[in-house]
Amino acid sequence: MKQDFKVYVRLLSYLKPYWGIALLVLVGFGINAATEVSVAKLLKYIIDAIQEGSRADLDWFPLLIVLLVFFRGLGLFMGGYYTAVISRRLIFSIRQEIYAKLIRLPSQYYLDNSSGHISAKIMYNVEQLTAASSESLKIMVKDGLITLGLLGYLLYTNWRLTLCIFIFMPIIGVLVRKASKRMRKLSIQVQNTMGDVNHVVQESIGGQAVVKSFVGEEFEQKRFYKSSEDNLKRGLKMVIVQNLNSPLVQLVMAMAMSLIVWLALRPQILGETTAGEFVAYITAAGLLAKPIKNLTDVNEKLQRGIAAAYSVFELLDLPSEENHGTQTPKLQGDVRFDHVTLEYAGQVKAIKDFNLTIEPGETVAIVGRSGAGKTSLVNLLVRFQEVTSGSLYLDHIPIQDIELSCLRQQVAMVNQQVVLFNRSVRENIAYGQLEGAAEADIVAAAKAAYAHDFIMNLPQGYDTILGAQGLNLSGGQRQRIAIARAILKNAPILILDEATSALDNESEHFIQKAFDEAMQNRTTIVIAHRLSTIENADRIVVMDKGQIIEQGTHQELLLKQGAYFQLHQRNFEE
């Protein structure tokens, strides 16, 4: 419970920027609470006036009723509207904070968590969290003020009789506490299963071509049915707890009301109480049932929100990528791996005691079988992964001493899996730090990547929207857009991770010529299975199981007739 309180206090801290609006919420619901108490008071005056036959007083009551309803509506509008304003702004600000954290988390987080579960946190969980911090607060303020107002009126009218209500409060407290624990557990399960649902949807949509080609529609439908069914079952269990708790609380309140009515009818209790006072008291006691019911019902929203808050705050409290570097050098492209080891979870070593020096402007090709550690090696250069032991130097500076954004601004990378965004061709080439690049530079980069001609044949040329992942383009065209992006960056270090593997022979020929020129005076690391693309590299490094087993020029390695020779023969046969 102490931990829950801390979480709720943290939730409420998000309301600080909106304290002025929150004050209007308090005023609005305060007016509404006053009208609830006034209903009982008005009944007292009406009944007493009727008994006394006071015609002058009776003439005012219609106007008072209209005023009462008007102010009640005004209070509800103020409270409801400004609560909604806070709620929507909270969703906006928390989502911004989560997204800012997500894009700064280490790459390992994305390897350990599915995209479906991640998106569920930013969409579904934030909505649930807002229910705790704003919607629940709305009910607690509105019905809390009504409850306090009615209890105050009851105590003022007959404090001895009102104490009967407090006798039943511990029973209500026990019911709410037990329901809270159960609903918290179920809320976490509902959120997890919602992540599973999102995961299945994103996988099937992203891999729709594979689903169709392997006739996997029925299989994916079953997967979606199972994950949705799990979510449904846990949701229904929450409904059972919620709907069982509410009638039990109402039963306890009915018992309290019955006791009050029974005692109120005793002559010794009635005393000199007027009919108006008696009816007003019973009315106020009856009006108390609804806000108390609402306050117990809000517990379900509160528990869902707190469960979501644990999930959201857990993400927000994760450490961002380490960026303790303070140096911002203009790199020349000198790279040195000094006894570098990269170890994954489970003590699996992707790189083992690796030593390699690359001179500025040198083109080094790294080849090897799948799983040899080639991609892991280049990931270290942009700190997508961190060195487990040993040291990595750029221009004789330890890589961790270089400020992270400065480092990445000076490394251009064409990934094995091309990533394009649902934006224009121009925006995809001039992406990120390249935004605002001159049109002439963008066109020059596209021409160097032999992309300009096909871009000009698109419906709107450089303004053509590519669609999700650029699926409107062929594999070779997507690859050339990515290469144009890397060329435009004009970084001192260029990494080509199997960059020409998706190109047809003609495109590969032209792009290889473009790269031969682009690689001048630039340190280039090329990873490729198609060995024909790296024959002109200054040096070829052959890796196996995270270690260098051979290195030299193309001709030198062929003469050795070792591992590279075997890879070359296999490529030639293919």
Swiss-Prot record:
It is a multi-pass membrane protein. The chain crosses the membrane at residues 11-31, 60-80, 156-176, 244-264. It catalyses: ATP + H2O + lipid A-core oligosaccharideSide 1 = ADP + phosphate + lipid A-core oligosaccharideSide 2. Its main location: membrane. Residues 335-570 form the ABC transporter domain. Its EC number is 7.5.2.6. Residues 23-304 form the ABC transmembrane type-1 domain. Keywords: ATP-binding, Cell inner membrane, Cell membrane, Lipid transport, Membrane, Nucleotide-binding, Translocase, Transmembrane, Transmembrane helix, Transport. It is found in: Cell inner membrane. The keyword Cell inner membrane applies. InterPro entries: AAA+_ATPase, ABC1_TM_dom, ABC1_TM_sf, ABC_transporter-like_ATP-bd, ABC_transporter-like_CS, ABC_transpr_lipidA, P-loop_NTPase, Type_1_exporter. ATP binds at G368, R369, S370, G371, A372, G373, K374, T375. NCBIfam families: MsbA_lipidA (TIGR02203). In MsbA the ATP-binding domain (NBD) and the transmembrane domain (TMD) are fused. Belongs to the ABC transporter superfamily. Lipid exporter (TC 3.A.1.106) family. This is ATP-dependent lipid A-core flippase. The gene is msbA.
